[in-house]
C-alpha cells in the first residue's frame, strides 16, 4: 500500500491560506496527504489539480481522496508540464500552488525502485517509469568526469573523484546492476575514518544519482517560474525542500521576486511600476517542530518557504539558471 507521511502538513496548508472556492495545485501529490487537507477545505466551487508522475502514487491518492472526487482533477505528469496541463483544462490562473519535493517514503521504504541504499534492488531511481534514463545507465555509461561533476554538484560529496574512479574500475570488469553493489563500491572508495561519521556513506551519491536521473533541479527551477506566472494576485506558492540545492533555488527566486526594482534616491516613494509583485510570507524557512521530528525523522531536513503575489507585473518570470551561482 502506498502510505506516505506528509511533512509540515499543517504549516504548508496554513501558508496557502486556502479559499473555499479557489483553484489549487498540488504539484507532488504522493500519497495524497497534503491534497486531502486542501480538498477538505474546498466547497463545490473549489478545485484541486493533483499532479504526480508516479502512477502508483496517483492511484493510491485517487483511492484516498475518493470522498472529494467531485473537486479534484488527477494529472499524471511531471510538474515541468504545469502550465501545459492546466491550459488543457482551461485554467490560466490559480490561487495556490504547493511543491513538496524529494522522494516519497514508500519509494524509499519499498526498496524495489532503487532509491534506497538500505535495500538491495536493481539500479533504477526513475520517478517516471516510462523514461529511458535510469541510475543503471548513469553509473555504467557516463564518463568519469561527468560522474565527478554530478557527485560534487548534486551530492556535495568531497570524495567524488575517488568514488567515480572506483566505479570506473569496477565497471571495466562487470556491470554495476544493483544498489548493494554500488554501496560496497562507495564504501571501498571512502577512507575508513570518514565512513564512521556524517551518516550513511552512500547517502550523498544516491541523492546525486536521483537528481541526475530525474533532472530534478532543472525541472523544479523551470516549474517554479511557471508557478509565478500562473499564480493569481493574493495567491500563494508554498515550497517544501529537503536539501540545500533545492532550497537555494527557492530562496533566490523568492528573494528576487519580492525585491523592488532599483529607483532613483530622490523619489519619496517607490513607484508602482517598480514595486515587487510578490511579498515573502515566511522571512525565514519554517522547519518541523519537535513533535513532528519524533514522529518522522525524515522531517529534520525539511524547510517550508511561502510567497504571496500582491500585484501583476511586467516581469515575464522566465526560466533562469541563476541558482547555479
Swiss-Prot record:
Q: Identify a single GO molecular function assigned to this protein.
A: rRNA (cytosine-N4-)-methyltransferase activity
Where is this chain's protein located in or outside the cell?
A: Cytoplasm
Its main subcellular localisation, reduced to a broad class, is cytoplasm
Q: Which reaction does it catalyse?
A: cytidine(1402) in 16S rRNA + S-adenosyl-L-methionine = N(4)-methylcytidine(1402) in 16S rRNA + S-adenosyl-L-homocysteine + H(+)
The EC code for this enzyme is 2.1.1.199
Spell out the Pfam families in the cross-references.
Answer: Methyltransf_5
A GO cellular component entry from the record: cytoplasm
Looking up InterPro entries in the UniProt record yields: RsmH (IPR002903), SAM-dep_MeTrfase_MraW_recog (IPR023397), SAM-dependent_MTases_sf (IPR029063)
Keywords (alphabetical) are:
Cytoplasm, Methyltransferase, rRNA processing, S-adenosyl-L-methionine, Transferase
UniProt: S-adenosyl-L-methionine binding residues: 32-34, 52, 79, 100, 107
Record GO biological process: rRNA base methylation
This chain's function reads: Specifically methylates the N4 position of cytidine in position 1402 (C1402) of 16S rRNA.
Family, according to the entry, reads as follows: Belongs to the methyltransferase superfamily. RsmH family.
What name has this protein been given in UniProt?
Answer: Ribosomal RNA small subunit methyltransferase H
Q: What species does this protein belong to? A: Oceanobacillus iheyensis (strain DSM 14371 / CIP 107618 / JCM 11309 / KCTC 3954 / HTE831)
Amino acid at each position: 500500500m502506498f502510505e506516505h507521511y506528509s511533512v509540515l502538513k499543517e504549516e504548508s496548508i496554513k501558508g496557502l491560506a486556502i479559499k473555499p472556492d479557489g483553484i489549487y495545485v498540488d504539484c507532488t501529490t504522493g500519497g495524497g496527504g497534503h491534497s486531502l487537507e486542501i480538498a477538505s477545505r474546498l466547497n463545490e466551487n473549489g478545485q484541486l489539480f493533483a499532479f504526480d508522475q508516479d502512477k502508483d502514487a496517483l492511484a493510491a491518492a485517487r483511492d484516498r481522496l475518493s470522498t472529494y472526487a467531485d473537486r479534484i482533477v488527477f494529472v499524471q505528469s511531471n510538474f515541468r508540464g504545469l502550465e501545459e496541463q492546466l491550459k488543457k483544462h482551461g485554467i490560466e490562473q490559480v490561487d495556490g500552488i504547493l511543491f513538496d519535493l524529494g522522494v516519497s517514503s514508500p519509494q524509499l521504504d519499498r526498496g524495489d525502485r532503487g532509491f534506497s541504499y538500505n535495500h538491495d534492488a536493481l539500479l533504477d531511481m526513475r520517478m517516471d517509469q516510462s523514461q529511458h534514463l535510469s541510475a543503471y545507465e548513469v553509473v555504467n555509461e557516463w564518463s568519469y568526469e561527468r560522474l565527478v561533476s554530478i557527485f560534487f554538484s548534486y551530492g556535495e560529496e568531497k570524495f567524488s573523484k575517488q568514488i567515480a574512479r572506483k566505479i570506473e574500475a569496477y565497471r571495466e570488469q562487470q556491470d554495476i546492476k544493483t544498489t548493494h553493489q554500488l554501496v560496497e563500491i562507495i564504501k571501498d572508495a571512502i577512507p575508513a575514518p570518514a565512513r564512521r561519521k556524517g551518516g550513511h556513506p552512500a547517502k550523498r551519491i544516491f541523492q546525486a544519482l536521483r537528481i541526475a536521473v530525474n533532472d530534478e533541479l532543472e525541472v523544479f527551477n523551470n516549474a517554479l517560474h511557471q508557478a509565478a506566472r500562473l499564480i493569481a494576485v493574493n495567491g500563494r506558492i508554498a515550497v517544501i525542500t529537503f536539501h540545500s540545492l533545492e532550497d537555494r533555488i527557492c530562496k533566490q527566486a523568492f528573494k528576487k521576486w519580492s525585491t523592488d526594482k532599483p529607483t532613483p534616491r530622490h523619489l519619496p516613494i517607490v513607484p508602482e511600476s517598480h514595486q515587487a509583485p510578490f511579498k515573502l510570507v515566511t522571512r525565514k524557512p519554517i522547519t518541523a517542530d519537535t513533535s513532528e521530528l519524533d514522529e518522522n525523522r525524515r522531517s529534520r531536513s525539511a524547510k517550508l518557504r511561502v510567497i504571496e503575489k500582491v500585484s501583476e507585473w511586467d516581469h515575464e518570470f522566465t526560466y533562469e539558471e541563476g541558482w547555479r551561482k
